[in-house]
Amino acid sequence: MGVRAQQKEKTRRSLVEAAFSQLSAERSFASLSLREVAREAGIAPTSFYRHFRDVDELGLTMVDESGLMLRQLMRQARQRIAKGGSVIRTSVSTFMEFIGNNPNAFRLLLRERSGTSAAFRAAVAREIQHFIAELADYLELENHMPRAFTEAQAEAMVTIVFSAGAEALDVGVEQRRQLEERLVLQLRMISKGAYYWYRREQEKTAIIPGNVKDE
């Protein structure tokens, strides 16, 4: 990558970070203006268009980055789990760390999931579907259940996780700890329920797999 290309990528990165920094519990992406973002990034408003067609393209890039960031962290958590440790507790702790370190990224996903822009809703839906698919892959590999079961389990887990994440955004340390404990319990209940439901179905044909991986 040449010097000019590197500088362009650096400025593009500055615009994304500037937009994230202006989000808050009181301020959504829809309220941001091109001028504000450009000023925060230290460039002229007209220079914005060298990097993004419009503010919406910037927002869609932010959605993609938020989803990717979360998925990468969860992959790292699964790698740690492979070395020993609780599957669910490690995953929940990693998720809560993500919210604590990147609250505006998670806020963006939550808000745009049900926002007024069809393009943003579709982008968030894709990111959530990627998240569900990766979790279903992991569950299928670890628990040896059919894809239909692991997808249903993964979807239920992700739904509960995102709901807990929304609660965790603006609470204190102790309340977040309590939320984390509740979430661990709920996910364990889903995990055990999914396995025993599958085992009941398999008992009809006397095909019972090994027990589900203990969390």
Swiss-Prot record:
Family matches, as SUPFAM superfamilies: Homeodomain-like (SSF46689)
Keyword Zinc-finger included in the entry's annotation: no
Localization (cell): Cytoplasm
Main location: cytoplasm
PROSITE patterns (UniProt xref): HTH_TETR_2
Coiled coil segments of this chain: none
InterPro entries: DesT_TetR_C (IPR054129), Homeodomain-like_sf (IPR009057), HTH_TetR (IPR001647), HTH_transcr_repressor_FabR (IPR050692), Tscrpt_reg_HTH_FabR (IPR023764)
Domain HTH tetR-type: 10-70
Listed Pfam families: TetR_C_46, TetR_N
Keywords: Cytoplasm, DNA-binding, Fatty acid biosynthesis, Fatty acid metabolism, Lipid biosynthesis, Lipid metabolism, Repressor, Transcription, Transcription regulation
GO CC terms in record: cytoplasm
DNA-binding region(s) in UniProt: 33-52
One MF annotation (Gene Ontology) recorded for this entry: DNA-binding transcription factor activity
GO biological process, one term: fatty acid biosynthetic process
Subunit structure: Homodimer.
PANTHER family: HTH-TYPE TRANSCRIPTIONAL REPRESSOR FABR (PTHR47752:SF1)
Role: Represses the transcription of fabB, involved in unsaturated fatty acid (UFA) biosynthesis. By controlling UFA production, FabR directly influences the physical properties of the membrane bilayer.
Descriptive protein name: HTH-type transcriptional repressor FabR
Organism: Escherichia coli O139:H28 (strain E24377A / ETEC)
